[in-house]
Amino acid sequence: MENRWQVMIVWQVDRMRIRTWKSLVKHHMYVSKKASRWFYRHHYDSPHPKISSEVHIPLGEARLVVKTYWGLHTGERDWHLGQGVSIEWRKRRYSTQVDPGLADQLIHMYYFDCFSEAAIRKAILGHIVSHRCEYQAGHSKVGSLQYLALTALIAPKKIKPPLPSVRKLTEDRWNKPQKTKGHKGAIQ
């Protein structure tokens, strides 16, 4: 019988970013209680030796599973050190991988209060409107001019510590393009 390979997307992440993610998740699960329905699985509870942790985030009937890995093949840079993250959406027997932006939007829809574009309509109808968004990472696009005007009137309150963003966890802060020097040291 032949070997059958299964390929999955694993985002290379440095270990300090993974530590920050884990501590933010635990803080909002146990201290602030904003993520009290989330489930954190430690490395010693996982049957796979490369999984360092799993966070199960219920989304209605489905759930989002964010797995962190260690001991993977090292990346191009020394600081990658074989750490990684995979993000999976599961519903019953079906599962698929999602990108960090979509994961943040899904988390935002289910868990955190938001002052969204629907707030304009609610305010006109005289309904009570949430005056700020607790989870800015869940917004991937620029809002309408009305939305931007209303958000300019109400300054967003900084939440300490910040809410755990999957996009921020997988962000590549090391490989930003560098400015090169051209003729006689002038930056191009």
UniProtKB/Swiss-Prot annotation:
Residue stretches spanning the membrane: none
Report the GO terms under cellular component.
host cell cytoplasm; host cell plasma membrane; membrane; virion component
Modification note: Processed in virion by the viral protease. Highly phosphorylated on serine and threonine residues.
Q: Which UniProt keywords apply?
A: AIDS, Host cell membrane, Host cytoplasm, Host membrane, Host-virus interaction, Membrane, Metal-binding, Phosphoprotein, RNA-binding, Ubl conjugation, Ubl conjugation pathway, Virion, Zinc
| Any GO MF annotation of the entry | RNA binding
Biased region (Basic residues) positions are 176-188
Site note Cleavage in virion (by viral protease) applies to: 150-151
Q: What residue spans carry the region label Multimerization?
A: 151-164
Question: Which annotated residues bind Zn(2+)?
Answer: 108, 114, 133, 139
**Positions of region (Membrane association):** 171-172
Q: Which Pfam families match?
A: Vif (PF00559)
> Region entry Disordered: which residue ranges?
166-188
**Annotated region (Interaction with host APOBEC3F and APOBEC3G), positions in chain:** 54-72
Q: How does it assemble?
A: Homomultimer; in vitro and presumably in vivo. Interacts with viral RNA and Pr55Gag precursor; these interactions mediate Vif incorporation into the virion. Interacts with the viral reverse transcriptase. Forms cullin-5-RING E3 ubiquitin-protein ligase complex (ECS complex) by interacting with host CUL5, RBX2, elongin BC complex (ELOB and ELOC) and CBFB/CBF-beta. Within the ECS complex, Vif interacts directly with host CUL5, ELOC and APOBEC (APOBEC3F and APOBEC3G) substrates.
Q: What remark does the entry add?
A: Vif-defective viruses show catastrophic failure in reverse transcription due to APOBEC-induced mutations that initiate a DNA base repair pathway and compromise the structural integrity of the ssDNA. In the absence of Vif, the virion is morphologically abnormal. HIV-1 lineages are divided in three main groups, M (for Major), O (for Outlier), and N (for New, or Non-M, Non-O). The vast majority of strains found worldwide belong to the group M. Group O seems to be endemic to and largely confined to Cameroon and neighboring countries in West Central Africa, where these viruses represent a small minority of HIV-1 strains. The group N is represented by a limited number of isolates from Cameroonian persons. The group M is further subdivided in 9 clades or subtypes (A to D, F to H, J and K).
Q: What is known of its domains?
A: The BC-like-box motif mediates the interaction with elongin BC complex. The HCCH motif (H-x(5)-C-x(18)-C-x(5)-H) mediates the interaction with CUL5.
What's this protein's name? Answer: Virion infectivity factor
| Organism of origin | Human immunodeficiency virus type 1 group M subtype D (isolate Z6)
